[in-house]
């Protein structure tokens, strides 16, 4: 019975996180229509995503510690209520400024999903079961980035861009009702109440947590760099149509799905899987960088390294998240907040940096992805050395 309850909670958690992920990308096929309806240039509409990502990352730093003090349920319900209110504003506005503000408010609400994606599995599982649960969760979460642009394009074609936000409103209302009706409180009953600064000091004082955190930031930042650069490289440099770019853009995502599945196999050692993950990320960065040394760039030199990096990152996310969260059962909310918040902030910084670098070839992208691969490897080496002396921690 408990096992079935935990599975149901994971399914609800996948839907909770999907709301936030779909809000980020569902309107992308409708950007041209949004710009025309709001009487602004298309580039200005991109500010909607920037505002969303900023508050999505920052809000997680607050949701986690609060959930450690008052529980998971009330924090989830408050966050989703904020999202629904913001989405209602987005549906009815005719001003880009108001839409940007509403998007920032949406991110402020769905940040709770990013925290709970890392916190609830730690409440429910330990060790190998935690790794397996995180792998299943990541596999489920990876479906929404594939579906969101397709759903958004269909809704925009059949109605208009506002239908995308109406869809998000209905989806969020259904998820919120389900969690209010069936989700139990998962915060450990004997969890001590600690001050926020004390919690952060405990986490940042743990070298293992810091290493796993930097690895997770590097993994997501490498993906963000590809997402930020690939549209320009394939569209402006290679001259591909927008529809072709949209299709090619999502092709590496199944590799991340497969990586998450690969990491969740219970018969493999944690350290072995980690080595495979970090090597894939570093090798992918080099494969993305090397073609530029010879002045070569085509669809294959972009997508093959990207798919390899997505595969490595797909393995890394559940593995490193489990490694970071395992030692802190009573600080799961705060730990999840730091992991989720700093991951998104770090990826946003790297995406902004990539926009400042030359985009005439894949050299800048390859350099950034290689640096992220090096960061991941350098953070893993001390952990691997420690494991060889102490045994498997997860």
UniProtKB/Swiss-Prot annotation:
From what superkingdom does this record's organism come? Answer: Bacteria
Topological domains annotated Cytoplasmic: 1-8, 68-73, 117-134, 184-212, 264-276, 320-329, 386-394
Q: Which UniProt keywords apply?
A: Cell inner membrane, Cell membrane, Membrane, Transmembrane, Transmembrane helix, Transport
| Residue ranges, Periplasmic side | 30-46, 95, 156-162, 234-242, 298, 351-364
Q: What is its main location?
A: membrane
PROSITE patterns registered for this protein in UniProt? MFS
| GO function term, MF aspect, one | transmembrane transporter activity
Membrane topology value = Multi-pass membrane protein
Q: Where in the cell is it found?
A: Cell inner membrane
Statement: the UniProt record of this protein carries the keyword Transmembrane? yes
Q: Which residues cross the membrane?
A: 9-29, 47-67, 74-94, 96-116, 135-155, 163-183, 213-233, 243-263, 277-297, 299-319, 330-350, 365-385
InterPro entries xref list:
MFS, MFS_dom, MFS_trans_sf, Multidrug-R
* CDD domains xref list: MFS_MdfA_MDR_like (cd17320)
One GO CC annotation: plasma membrane
Gene3D superfamilies (UniProt xref) = Multidrug resistance protein D (1.20.1720.10)
Biological process according to GO: xenobiotic detoxification by transmembrane export across the plasma membrane
Q: What does this protein do?
A: Multidrug resistance pump that participates in a low energy shock adaptive response.
Q: Which family does it belong to?
A: Belongs to the major facilitator superfamily.
Protein name from the UniProt record: Multidrug resistance protein D
